[in-house]
């Protein structure tokens, strides 16, 4: 049987290891308990987290046991990795709400039945931690000089790094130590932006417990130009259908650049590699077939087959190939709003994130109403605009929404 490491490397997941040869041997010889941490900074996971869950799912399918750690404790501080400013402090109530929402989402991707996976919250051991004890037990193993050389701190030193955030590395390292002691967790997986924190955890376990510990990082989801993927005009591409509709989610993947199709098929689907290679080799207009497969498969994993089919039908209806238009994202508008400016209504309906963005679309010719380009910022929405009680809004080349009179 192939080592899961070969599968992960072939599909492009692995970026860095702490101990590659030992990791390979470990994954071949035993069922390994590993963990990935997720900070509950929002009430939904986004597509950047999805790649981490696919990483976990491949490991679980190979017989290893995942621990999904939700950082209810570390979220009270905020991870400085990749940030140029200090994150806004969240209330305990907000964190608790976000934790509950994320738990529910994770259960769609990872099998937690019969102890096949474990869900933990580091608030359980961090929030009641005695500070002096923590410094004596954990702080003694960390070198400030070494910490300051870490990439996650380097970029913050000039702009100001709070002592609060400086503790984050210790807390994340302590998470690994706790999971190692309680669940015999031997490995941490995470995004490549977490590398410094992960090394700290590996070293803490090895020093404090005299146990072997390992880490490997997953590539971040970037396009062929090196930019992070998963951003839309309305912000992040969320996994929550209330934040990003299944149709909008489907359309995002349907419209990826040709150069990004292979990478997305590898990382975000379970399609066998032979089929990935076949789809990725398509050229010209045929590459659109690969994009349709990508969009359907990713939407099916996140929202289920029924919603993926509805999104596919809506896309086909809008692009002149028949299908069911009822699945296009729809906003119900009261008749009392007739005569209001279109851009105000689009902002209220969250079709555009702001009036400024709406004006930019109009200026660039990227906003249409019932097939006609909107040229006037102050265009009002009148009853005459509604055909059979609805209007069709088009943003850019392929983003559609309906507004119906309630």
Curated annotation (Swiss-Prot):
GO terms for cellular component: cytosol. The keyword ATP-binding applies. Gene3D superfamilies: HUPs, RNA-binding S4 domain, Tyrosyl-Transfer RNA Synthetase. CDD domains: S4 (cd00165), TyrRS_core (cd00805). It is found in: Cytoplasm. ATP binds at residue 231. InterPro entries: aa-tRNA-synth_I_CS (IPR001412), aa-tRNA-synth_Ic (IPR002305), Rossmann-like_a/b/a_fold (IPR014729), S4_RNA-bd_sf (IPR036986), SYY-like_C (IPR054608), Tyr-tRNA-ligase (IPR002307), Tyr-tRNA-ligase_bac-type (IPR024088), Tyr-tRNA-ligase_bac_1 (IPR024107). Residues 340-404 form the S4 RNA-binding domain. A motif ('KMSKS' region) lies at residues 228-232. Keywords: Aminoacyl-tRNA synthetase, ATP-binding, Cytoplasm, Ligase, Nucleotide-binding, Protein biosynthesis, RNA-binding. It catalyses: tRNA(Tyr) + L-tyrosine + ATP = L-tyrosyl-tRNA(Tyr) + AMP + diphosphate + H(+). Pfam families: SYY_C-terminal, tRNA-synt_1b. One of its GO terms (molecular function) is tyrosine-tRNA ligase activity. Its main location: cytoplasm. Coiled coil: none annotated. L-tyrosine binds at residues 35, 168, 172. Homodimer. PANTHER family: TYROSINE--TRNA LIGASE, MITOCHONDRIAL, TYROSYL-TRNA SYNTHETASE. Catalyzes the attachment of tyrosine to tRNA(Tyr) in a two-step reaction: tyrosine is first activated by ATP to form Tyr-AMP and then transferred to the acceptor end of tRNA(Tyr). This is Tyrosine--tRNA ligase. The gene is tyrS.
């Amino acid at each position: 049987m192939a080592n899961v490491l070969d599968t992960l490397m072939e599909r492009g997941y692995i970026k860095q290891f702490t101990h590659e040869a030992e990791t390979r041997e470990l994954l071949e010889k035993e069922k390994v308990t590993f963990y990935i941490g997720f900070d509950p900074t929002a009430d939904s996971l986004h597509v950047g987290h999805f790649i981490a869950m696919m990483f976990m799912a491949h490991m679980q399918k190979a017989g290893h046991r995942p621990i999904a750690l939700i950082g209810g404790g570390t979220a009270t501080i905020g991870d400085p990795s990749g940030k140029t400013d200090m994150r806004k402090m969240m209330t305990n109530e907000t964190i608790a709400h976000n934790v509950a929402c994320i738990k529910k989402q994770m259960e769609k991707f990872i099998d937690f039945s019969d102890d096949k996976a474990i869900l933990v919250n580091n608030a359980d051991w961090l929030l009641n931690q005695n500070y002096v004890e923590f410094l004596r037990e954990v702080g003694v193993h960390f070198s400030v000089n070494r910490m300051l050389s870490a990439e996650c701190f380097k970029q913050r030193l000039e702009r100001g790094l709070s002592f609060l955030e400086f503790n984050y590395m210790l807390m994340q390292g302590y998470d690994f130590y706790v999971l190692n002691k309680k669940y015999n967790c031997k490995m941490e997986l995470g995004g490549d932006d977490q590398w410094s924190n992960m090394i700290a955890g590996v070293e803490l376990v090895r020093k404090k417990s005299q146990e072997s510990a390992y880490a490997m990082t997953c590539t971040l989801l970037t396009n062929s130009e090196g930019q992070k993927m998963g951003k839309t005009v309305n912000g992040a591409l969320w996994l929550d259908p209330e934040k990003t509709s299944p149709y909008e989610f489907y359309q995002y993947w349907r419209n990826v650049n040709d150069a990004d199709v292979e990478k997305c098929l590898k990382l975000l689907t379970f399609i066998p590699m032979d089929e990935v290679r076949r789809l990725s080799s398509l050229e010209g207009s045929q590459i659109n077939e690969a994009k349709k497969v990508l969009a359907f498969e990713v939407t099916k994993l996140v929202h289920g087959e029924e919603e993926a089919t509805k999104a596919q039908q809506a896309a086909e209806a809008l692009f002149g190939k028949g299908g069911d238009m009822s699945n296009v994202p729809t906003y119900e508008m009261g008749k009392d709003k007739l005569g209001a400016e279109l851009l105000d209504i689009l902002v209220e309906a969250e079709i555009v994130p702001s009036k400024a963005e709406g004006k930019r679309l109009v200026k660039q010719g990227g906003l249409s109403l019932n097939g006609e380009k909107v040229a006037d910022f102050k265009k009002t929405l009148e009853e005459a605009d509604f055909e059979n009680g609805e209007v069709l809004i088009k943003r850019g080349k392929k983003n559609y929404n309906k507004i119906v009179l309630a």
